[in-house]
Swiss-Prot record:
Zinc-finger found in the keyword field: no
Similarity field: Belongs to the MHC class II family.
Record domain Ig-like C1-type: where: 123-211
Source species taxonomy: Eukaryota, Metazoa, Chordata, Craniata, Vertebrata
Protein name in UniProt: H-2 class II histocompatibility antigen, A-U beta chain
Membrane topology label: Single-pass type I membrane protein
GO biological process, one term: positive regulation of immune response
Glycosylated sites: N46
Residue ranges annotated as Cytoplasmic topological domain: 246-263
Amino acid sequence: MALQIPSLLLLAAVVVLMVLSSPGTEGGDSERHFVVQFQPFCYFTNGTQRIRYVTRYIYNREEYLRFDSDVGEYRAVTELGRPDAEYYNKQYLERTRAELDTVCRYNYEETEVPTSLRRLEQPNVVISLSRTEALNHHNTLVCSVTDFYPAKIKVRWFRNGQEETVGVSSTQLIRNGDWTFQVLVMLEMTPRRGEVYTCHVEHPSLKSPITVEWRAQSESARSKMLSGIGGCVLGVIFLGLGLFIRHRSQKGPRGPPPAGLLQ
């Protein structure tokens, strides 16, 4: 059965055991208090993307033993903790390591979290070329992924349907002022005619991945395409002007001229 702790103890839980000790002879010194503390901590980075689990053992306000999931074992902080460290590493180490998942991760996922942590923002994806396009010349494709939340995201490059792993680099996650993130993922490549490059983005806010394509083409083909688009735009403009002028010319009143103009 998975070990569970209340949600209020996710970041810090303190169990204080008061052990009262009195002298063995009657009428001796007044009773003395000895305080033993056990403090477990769960540290989260970007949700559950990275979790660190730390437990501290304290005797009379002095830490003597610690477990840190980044270290992976119990370590004595003072000489007092050395026997306990050896014993716990033999008897409880695997169970304590598992508590990173059974305690920290489990409670994070099961506990009601603030609205800001439940927020989902879908990324915007745009592909651009770092330099003017030229076939058979080294270049860099940039996949700009912006305005997404939470931070967990996976961006991959494909060429003609095959994933590219060589020549891929990425910036660190960049925080925006509205809590969203952005990242740039670059692909060093040499474009050749007919090749199709795809930026593939996976994110918790998406039901299915976003894929944006970029196709390599020659300058002449690009010029013809731009000329065709320009011709279509001009055609639409002139057609609109013609219809407007025709409509205006038909709006005037019809009928006989005014009587004063008759000879």
